[in-house]
Amino acid sequence: MKNSPTKNFHILLDRISLTVPEQEAALNRAESVRENLMNFSLVQECVITGSMARSTAIRTFSDVDIIAIINDDPKMMENSKLAISAISDYLARTYSSIEDFDSAVHITLNDGPGIDVVPAFIAGKNTSGHSLFKIPAEQRSWINYDPAGQDQRIEQLSLQLGDEFKQAIRLAKWWSRANGSPIPSYEIEGVMSRTFLKWTEMPTPPEALATFFREADANKPDKVTGHGKSVIRKAALMAQDALELAAQGDTAGSMERWRCLLGEQFPTVVF
C-alpha cells in the first residue's frame, strides 16, 4: 500500500529491539548470576529463560529471567515469601541493588537489563517431557509455570511465520509498557501465539498489532484488571481506526493514531 505506515513500524522496531551484542551481553551477565546462585545450598539448578532468551525482549523494559530451582521445603511451600527472602538475602551479599517482589527478586545493573531471579519448585513434566514449575505468586502462594512450553510455542510459530512473529510480540510489549502494562509480558506472548496459531504468514506490522488487539479484547488474559480491559478495548478501537484511515489514504491521520498507541518513539513522518 502506497504511503502505508509499515515503514514507520520497522523504524520503531529498530529503536525498541536489542541488537545481537546487547542481547548476548545481557545473557552473559545472567550467566554470571546463575553461576553465583549455584553456590547457594538452597539452590539445586538454575535455568535462564524469559523474553531475553526467546528473543522477544524490548529495549529499556525487558529483564533476564533466571529460574532458581530450590530444595523442597515444607515451610517455603506454604509461604512463597520465605523463598523470595532466602534468595534475596543470598544475592545481597554480592549485588548492591536488590528489590523483592511477590514473584521474583530483581537485581538492577548499571550496564544493561536487570535480572529477575524466580525461586521455583519442580512440579512435574509437560507433554513434551520438560519440567513444569511452581513459582511465587501474590498472597504468598505458588502458581504453575511452563517456560519450556512457552519457548517451544514461540519457536514453532517463528519457524512457521518468520521473524515477523517475534516482531509483533515486541510491538505489543512496547504498546503495553507505553500504556501502563495492562497485559503482562508473559501473557502477551500467549495471546500472540493463540492469535496467529493457524496463520500461514504474518500480516504487515500494523495489521498484526490490530489483530492482536482484537483477540486480546475478545478473549482477555486472566490477569487483566478492570482498568486494563478498558485500555485494551480503547487500543482495539484506535488500531482499527488507524487501519481504516490508511486504507482511505489518510496516512498522516493513521500514523497519529499509532503514535497515540505506541508513544513518542513511533515516527510520524510520511514516506
Q: Could you say what each language-model-derived stretch is?
A:
Residues 130-172:
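A structural motif
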Residues 81-128:
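Conserved catalytic core of two-metal-ion nucleotidyltransferases
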Residues 67-69:
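Short hydrophobic/aromatic beta-strand micro-patches
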